[in-house]
Design a protein with these regions (language model features):
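Active-site nucleotide-donor binding segment shared across nucleotidyl transfer reactions
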Residues: 1-47
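Charged/polar positions within long, soluble alpha-helices
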Residues: 3, 58, 62, 69, ...
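Core structural elements
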Residues: 19-22, 119-132, 144-161
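Conserved structured core elements
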Residues: 29, 44-47, 51, 119, ...
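Conserved catalytic core of two-metal-ion nucleotidyltransferases
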Residues: 48-95
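C-terminal or mid-to-C-terminal helical accessory/interaction module adjacent to the motor/catalytic core
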Residues: 86-138
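Single conserved hydrophobic/aromatic residue that forms the stacking wall/gate
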Residues: 159-169
Length: 169
């Protein structure tokens, strides 16, 4: 309803849930990962429409982790960053131009073969393990990033699905 209230439905923007919200795993006190995707470059007039929408999200108690990108910018970011690619894999349309609903997967498939994606996820996990070495013995272990944490569970779910998009949470 906020998307329409701020007349973002009158634009070519599409609002996607990504991350935990895209997976349907929003936890208490989590930020809400969102992607606003435009087929055209983001100009100042569009930014002027987006700003009050984001402010209202904050006002009603939502902690948005919002990314605003054109399709071209998203394509470039996806090509270079496994984190962006993963967010596109988990993207779920919330509002806007339904014609763009499949764009996140199209961008992912354009830039990443399944093998390349899985290899990058494994490299990401190895890097995370080095960073969080032996943190499972800390007084307050990092349940999200430490070995055996939520990030590993999500990676396992990706590996055990016939297609990454087919996996269930």
């Amino acid at each position: 309803a906020l998307f329409e209230l701020y007349e973002l439905d009158q634009t070519d923007l599409t609002l996607f849930a990504t991350g935990g919200y895209g997976r349907g795993e929003l936890h208490p006190f989590s930020d809400v990962d969102l992607l606003l995707l435009s087929p055209n470059p983001i100009d100042e007039a569009l930014n002027q429409k987006i700003s009050p929408f984001v402010a209202k999200l904050w006002d009603i108690g939502i902690d948005p982790a919002l990314v605003v990108r054109s399709v071209e910018e998203c394509d470039e970011a996806c090509h270079d960053d496994i984190t962006v690619a993963t967010s596109l894999l988990e993207a779920r349309i919330l509002a806007g131009n339904v014609v763009q609903a499949g764009l996140p997967m199209q961008l992912l498939n354009k830039n990443w073969s399944q093998t390349k994606f899985y290899e990058a996820k494994m490299a990401e996990a190895k890097e995370r393990y080095l960073k969080h070495n032996s943190t499972e013995y800390n007084l307050e272990p990092d349940l999200k990033n430490a070995p055996g944490g939520l990030r590993d569970i999500h990676t396992c779910l990706l590996y055990t699905s016939p297609s990454p998009r087919d996996r269930t949470s």
